Amino acid sequence: MPEATPFQVMIVDDHPLMRRGVRQLLELDPGSEVVAEAGDGASAIDLANRLDIDVILLDLNMKGMSGLDTLNALRRDGVTAQIIILTVSDASSDVFALIDAGADGYLLKDSDPEVLLEAIRAGAKGSKVFSERVNQYLREREMFGAEEDPFSVLTERELDVLHELAQGLSNKQIASVLNISEQTVKVHIRNLLRKLNVRSRVAATILFLQQRGAQ
């Protein structure tokens, strides 16, 4: 009986060391073959449109084009490969954004290597694959509905910053009100924008005001 053809994998991550580690893990499985690597979203899109790839392992937080933007572009281009997010982020906002955008799986980089490899194998066969923490988020969303509080992923301090931001205060003014440094304010704003999956202070403010008005 002829051996089954290995499924073709592309690894997309802006950290060379991580790409090497994932490649070494996949090389333990004769049923898989890494045929491409990309260090950024644009390169991944180019390779995905030129090569016959079965599985794309896509990092979320990359320099330049984010994993979400890359995923959206791949789907717009009609790429049919199984796209599995492989990331350190277990924020529910990231999970829902990527899955709603069409990801076929969401795996965490701190997963046990054997568990990770088994999940990738299952994904190559067409299954939806998620780490346990991600499955928990999905079960909770199904149980309580998609209209959950979008701010539940924020820390108390991030909520404080967002509240002041929505009042139109500058970073310097927020720092004064909350008695923290202006640099700390910038860090909190960057983190809350990422968690809320919005790109600007204005978008975060609009979301905050809309949600507050709905309550």
UniProtKB/Swiss-Prot annotation:
Alphabetized CDD domains for the sequence: LuxR_C_like
What GO biological process, any one, is recorded here?
nitrate assimilation
MF terms per GO, please?
ATP binding; DNA binding
Q: Which residues bind DNA?
A: 171-190
Residue intervals of the Response regulatory domain: 8-124
Q: Does the keyword Ion transport apply?
A: no
- Keywords, in A-Z order: Activator, ATP-binding, DNA-binding, Nitrate assimilation, Nucleotide-binding, Phosphoprotein, Repressor, Transcription, Transcription regulation, Two-component regulatory system
Record bears the keyword Phosphoprotein: yes
Outline the extent of the HTH luxR-type domain: 147-212
Q: Which Pfam families does this chain map to?
A: GerE, Response_reg
> Which parts of the sequence carry 4-aspartylphosphate?
59
Q: What does this protein do?
A: This protein activates the expression of the nitrate reductase (narGHJI) and formate dehydrogenase-N (fdnGHI) operons and represses the transcription of the fumarate reductase (frdABCD) operon in response to a nitrate/nitrite induction signal transmitted by either the NarX or NarQ proteins.
Q: What is this protein called?
A: Nitrate/nitrite response regulator protein NarP
In its UniProt entry, the species of origin is given as Escherichia coli (strain K12)
Per the record, the gene is narP
